[in-house]
Design a protein with these regions (language model features):
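Conserved glycine(s) of the Walker
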Residues: 27, 167, 259
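Canonical P-loop GTPase G-domain recognition
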Residues: 125, 134-192
C-alpha cells in the first residue's frame, strides 16, 4: 500500500505525531501497518501484544504523519500491565492529534467505555475511528457514532477496516490537511523509528505469541544479542527468549526442539523479507526468574518501571 499513500508534493510541508489509542485487540497495530504500508508493528490474535510505543511513518501528499502505536488500554493486573497502560496515555498526551479506535463489533463496552471517560484529560484534537465496519450493520454504526460523540467532542468520525484498508485514504487525507505546517522529522524513505535489532526481536515475539497459548507468551521477553553483517551480504542474528521458569523453557523448546524451530523459521522469513537479505537466525531460551520485576528489562522495552 505504500505507493498509494505517496503523492506529488507542492506547497508547504506538514508534519506531526498522531497517537492511536484503544482497547486491546481493537486493531491498532494492524491499522498502523495498513496506513504506513509496511509491517512496523507486530500483530497477533492475543490481547496486549504491543508492549511499548512503536512509531510508524507515513508520507501522504505534502505531509509526514508519524503514527504512534500504543499498548492497549485495560485494567492492569501486573506491574508490566501498569507500565503499558501508563505508556499508552503518555503517548496520547505527547501527540499532536489522538485517534481513538473502537472495535465496532464490540461497541462501547468495558475498556472502550472507560477510555472514552478518561479522554476528558486529553486536550489534543481527537478523531473517532470505528474499525471492522465491514462486519457491522449500518444502523449499529450510526448508533455507535452518535453514542461516542455524545460522550466525547470528536473533531471527525471515520469508518475504517484495518484489515482491508477501507477508509484509510480518507483518514490520511484528513491528517495531511490537519497536522501543523513544519519540516519533516524523518527521511522520506523511513517507515519506523524502531531500530532493526529491536524490530527483529519484536517479530520473534510475535511468532512466539502465535505459536504458544495461555499465559506463557506474557511471561516471555525477546532480546537481540548479536547482529553481524557478513561479507557475503547475509546477516547473522542471535536472539534470546527469556522465560521465568524451567517448565516454560521446555514448552518453548517443544518436543525435540520442534516449537522453537518453527518459531525461528517463521521469524527468519519475516526478518529476511524486511531486510531483503539472507538471514541466519539463531534462537536460545534462557530462564530469567522474575524478569517482569526487573527495571532494566523495562528500559529495554521503552517502558517506565512502575514503583
Amino acid at each position: 500500500m505504500a505507493d498509494e499513500h505517496t503523492e506529488t508534493r507542492s506547497g508547504p510541508t506538514h508534519s506531526g505525531f498522531v497517537a492511536l489509542i484503544g482497547a486491546p485487540n481493537a486493531g491498532k497495530s494492524t491499522l498502523v501497518n495498513q496506513l504506513v504500508g509496511a509491517k512496523v508493528s507486530i500483530v497477533t490474535h492475543k490481547v496486549q501484544t504491543t508492549r511499548a510505543i512503536v512509531r510508524g511513518i507515513a508520507t501522504h501528499k505534502n505531509a509526514q504523519i508519524v503514527f504512534v502505536d500504543t499498548p492497549g488500554i485495560f485494567k492492569p493486573r501486573r506491574r508490566l500491565d501498569t507500565a503499558m497502560v501508563t505508556t499508552a496515555w503518555g503517548g496520547a498526551k505527547d501527540a499532536d492529534m489522538v485517534l481513538v479506535l473502537i472495535d465496532a463489533q464490540r461497541g462501547l463496552k468495558g475498556d472502550a467505555a472507560e477510555i472514552l471517560e478518561r479522554l476528558a484529560d486529553i486536550r489534543q484534537p481527537k478523531a473517532l475511528l470505528l474499525n471492522k465496519v465491514d462486519r457491522v450493520k449500518p444502523e449499529k454504526l450510526l448508533e455507535l457514532t452518535q453514542a461516542a460523540n455524545a460522550r466525547v467532542d470528536f473533531a471527525r468520525t471515520f469508518m475504517v477496516s484495518a484489515l482491508t484498508g477501507s477508509g484509510c485514504k480518507d483518514l490520511l487525507d484528513y491528517l495531511a490537511e490537519t497536522l501543523p505546517e513544519g519540516p519533516w522529522y524523518y527521511p522520506e524513505d523511513q517507515i519506523s523509528d524502531l531500530p532493526m535489532r529491536q524490530l527483529a526481536a519484536e517479530i520473534t515475539r510475535e511468532k512466539l505469541y502465535l505459536r504458544l497459548h495461555q499465559e506463557l507468551p506474557y511471561s516471555s521477553h525477546v532480546e537481540t544479542e548479536k547482529w553481524e553483517e557478513k561479507q557475503n551480504g547475509s546477516v547473522r542474528i542471535e536472539q534470546v527468549i527469556y522465560v521465568e521458569r524451567d517448565s516454560q523453557k521446555k514448552i518453548v523448546l517443544g518436543h525435540k526442539g520442534e516449537t522453537i524451530r518453527a518459531i525461528g523459521q517463521a521469524s527468519r522469513a519475516d526478518i529476511a523479507g524486511i531486510l531483503e537479505q539472507k538471514v541466519h537466525l539463531f534462537l536460545f531460551v534462557k530462564v530469567r526468574e522474575n524478569w517482569g520485576n526487573d527495571p532494566e528489562r523495562y528500559r529495554e522495552m521503552g517502558l517506565e518501571f512502575p514503583r
